[in-house]
Each structure stands twice: as C-alpha cells, then as structure tokens.
C-alpha cells in the first residue's frame, strides 16, 4: 500500500503540517496510523514524501525509520536529489524510490525528444549512483 504522507505541492502545508494538541502533525499521524494497519509495515507500506520537503525527511524518518519512501519531485518540481539522499536515506541501505517524470519527459519538445529524455534519465541515474556510493 502506498500512502500520501508529505507532498510537494505548495498547498500541502495547509493540511499536512496541521498539528493536534500533542503537536503531532497530520503527516506524522498518517504514517503512525497506517503502520498499525499492516502485519508487516516494512514490507507492506510505502509513503509518498515530496522531494521539495528537504529537511522534513528528518521528521518523516523519525516516525518511519525503515520504511520505503516514494519520492516524486526531483528535477522540474525543484526537489534536490542531494537533500533527499542526505535526509531521507536509511543508513547502510537506500530506502528511497526516487521519481523524476517532468524533468525527463519534458527534456525536449523537438525531434530530439528521445535523445534528450535519455540524457536526462542517464544524468539522474549517475547522480543517484554517486550518492549511493558516498553513502556506503
């Protein structure tokens, strides 16, 4: 099951950062509650956390330290792959599934679309590989 936790859109702060009397923010409550639904949360749950959230990955990892995170928003939406890796990776593992759609599919609108998309995908792949190597 993949659940929205903390999205990249500007309006997300209107709701996802809302906190209750115990100062638990909505995105934290979503993660905490969802983990009670699954027999094996680490194998059955993944949480969507937008790449534009940067240091907020620290708070997400506090409530979901080993969970896989689906991370959209790298590239065209302005999310930093370096910040995602720095604050979101699990020590000794990765724990991230990074998605960059617009940065790749809109690399060119010309006849060189396929080549431009391939270049952008390869560039992102190489950046990810470099960050994974550093994390070892």
What label would you give each PLM region?
Residues 35-39, 60-64, 125, 129:
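Surface-exposed amphipathic alpha-helices with a cationic face
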Residues 1-45:
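Conserved anion-binding
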Residues 4-5, 99-101:
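Short internal beta-strands
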Residues 23, 27, 53, 77, ...:
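Generic structural signal for well-ordered, non-membrane alpha-helical segments
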Residues 27, 31, 57, 81, ...:
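Generic structural signal for well-ordered alpha-helices
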Residues 83-93, 106-136:
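C-terminal helical cap(s) of enzyme catalytic domains, especially alpha/beta-barrels
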Residues 9-12, 77-78, 104-106:
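Short, small-residue-enriched loops and turns at beta-alpha junctions
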Residues 47, 51-97, 103:
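A C-terminal functional module that forms or caps the active site or interfaces directly
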């Amino acid at each position: 099951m993949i659940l929205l936790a903390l999205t990249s859109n500007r309006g997300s702060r209107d709701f996802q950062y809302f906190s209750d009397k115990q100062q638990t923010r909505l995105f934290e409550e979503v993660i905490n509650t969802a983990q009670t639904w699954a027999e094996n949360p680490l194998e059955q749950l993944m949480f969507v956390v937008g790449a534009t959230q940067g240091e907020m990955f620290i708070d997400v990892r506090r409530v979901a330290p080993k969970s896989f995170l689906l991370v959209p928003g790298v590239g065209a939406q302005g999310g930093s792959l370096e910040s995602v890796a720095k604050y979101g990776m699990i020590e000794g593992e990765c724990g991230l599934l990074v998605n960059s759609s617009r940065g790749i599919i809109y690399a060119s609108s010309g006849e060189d679309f396929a080549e431009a998309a391939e270049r952008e995908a390869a560039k992102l792949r190489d950046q990810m590989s470099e960050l994974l190597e550093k994390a070892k």
